[in-house]
Amino acid sequence: MPLLILAATGPALATGLGAVPVFFMGRRAAAWQPALWGLAAGVMAVASIVGLLQPALDQGSLVAVAGGLAAGTAFLVVTRVALSSTHPHVGQLRGADVRTSILVFGVLFVHSLPEGFAIGTVYASETAGLGLFVILAIALQNIPEGTSVAIPMADAGFSRRQQFWAAVATSAPQPVGAAVAFALVETVSGLLAV
């Protein structure tokens, strides 16, 4: 289990790595924002379609997949509406960039738990080499997520350190999800062996 937690922490650190390019842009981050958002969205969209949507359609019904997509979309719309009617601030920072920072952070934080489930399930299955492949795939996909976190934070005036650790924190659920999934698979496997 300690090796699993360590392995699941790697993709979280990769999310922090995604914040690093934004550090070097300084005031130019705003000019690069459309390109960075586009890059991050493109990578995440392809990862979602190839890594999530296609396997879901292969394993389940179109109705179930459409229901999941609708629920996720509704969650984002409700969250965005709730944030737009408030005036969030962090310290002296206020405005739309703070709102966007909170929304992006929250969505990616929630999104990280199933990634942890994937890591824990693969490690519990003891499939040679697959665990490392899943960790590397999630880590690569997490890099643009870190960029997505850092972009609005840079515009809102957050420090580089805050951008980096906020990006890493969005993936904090991954080790927790990995441990929970690993324990569940081990428990169920033990029950099936009886």
Task: Explain the meaning of each model-derived region.
Residues 1-194:
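Intrinsically disordered, metal-sensing/regulatory segments
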